[in-house]
Structures are given as C-alpha cells and as structure tokens.
Amino acid sequence: MLKTFSIGGVHPHENKLSAHQPIVQAEIPAKAVILLGQHIGAPAKPIVAKGDVVKVGTKIAEPGGFVSAAIHSSVSGKVAKIDTVVDASGYAKPAIFIDVEGDEWEESIDRTETLVKECNLTAEEIVKKIADAGIVGLGGACFPTQVKLCPPPAFKAECVIINAVECEPYLTADHQLMLEHAEEIMVGVSILMKAVKVNKAFIGIENNKPDACLLYTSQSPRD
C-alpha cells in the first residue's frame, strides 16, 4: 500500500490582502528577458538569433524534449542577445534578451474579445495546438500541458480534474482569474474534456473562496 500523510500538517496563516483586486495590464517595458526554462523538464531551444525582429506571439524557442514547452515573445522588438541571467532562485539560466520596440502582434493572433464556444478540432488537433502554444500549468512546476493530455496507450482517462487551489498563502491571482474569466475557463474545461475524450470534469476550489464556489456551481451542468 502507498503511504499517506497523517492527518495534520502545517497550514500557514493566509495573507490575502490583494484578494478581489482587479487584474490590470502591465506597462510595456523597454527591455525584456525571456527565460528558456519557464517549465519543468528540458529548457526550450532558441530558434531566433541576435538581430532578429520579433512580434508579440512570435515563437522564439521550441521544446527541448518530450517534457518541455515552446516559448513565444510577449513583446515586439529586436533580439539583443541570447545569454544567461540569474533567475529568482539564484541560478544562471539561458534567456533571450529583447530590446522592445512598439507593440506589434503576429497576424495569426485573434485579438477580438468574442469568445468562441464551439471547438471543431479533433482530440489530436487540440493537443497539437496546446503544444504549439507552449501552454503549461499554473502550479510551481509549470508542467507542459500537452504531456498531461497524452497518457500511455494502455491507460484511458476517466475524467478531467481542474486544480483551482492556490498553492501558497500570499497568492490571489488564481482566485481573481476565476472570478473575472469564469466563462472562458468553462469553455477551456470543455476543450480539455474533448482532448482526453471524457464526458466528466471536476473543479477543485478551496472553501476559503465561497464566491468562486458559488459562481462555478451555478455555471457547471450536473449529471
């Protein structure tokens, strides 16, 4: 039998002073440093070089292995260099440095605010688009999402479980995202269900977020 944790443990005091503050758009910086290891697994491999012009949404690095993720530019401008930078953990990591110029976006990006609720893609096409987009989880590991959606052939998923539990006592971004973008999240859940070919999903929300619990209970169809 697997060992389990005994009942108890440490529950740090919550510090949610930023709760219920609206999400705001950050100002465009003069320079951007985009790490190539923003996820668990192998770092992404750069596909741009010094002097290349990039736009918002330009793919600048491709996955470096099966457990890896593509990376896209979040700014427009010119690649200044590819070098190492000391990250928040104190380790030198490879990164792409960009001198920001303007706010040009890739033409393939749909910037309209209309929410498309119907997905006509196959499960395989959905997984490929997720991989191409470099989507990763919001947890500390930033696990590449396409890997989660590709279980071994001998195993079949029974349901989708959405972990909407904030993983540390100061974090409030997930809570606010759930409140401001509930409809988009529910559409995303339905797309994930199609990707793994199941008809059931569960969303786990902490009991310290009664507003989110009420909101998603009202939006979720029940069997």
PLM region spans:
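Conserved small/polar residues in nucleotide/adenosyl-binding loops
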Residues: 216-223
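N-terminal, Lys/Arg-enriched amphipathic/low-complexity engagement segments
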Residues: 1-43, 47
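Short, Lys/Arg- and Gly-enriched loop/turn segments at beta-strand edges
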Residues: 63-73, 91
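Conserved hydrophobic positions within beta-strands
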Residues: 77-79
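Acidic low-complexity segments
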Residues: 86-143, 154, 210
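Short, well-structured beta-strand-loop connectors
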Residues: 49-62, 81
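Gly-rich Lys/Arg/Thr-decorated short loops/hinges at beta-loop-alpha junctions or inter-strand turns
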Residues: 162-174
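Internal alpha/beta scaffold segment
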Residues: 119, 176-215
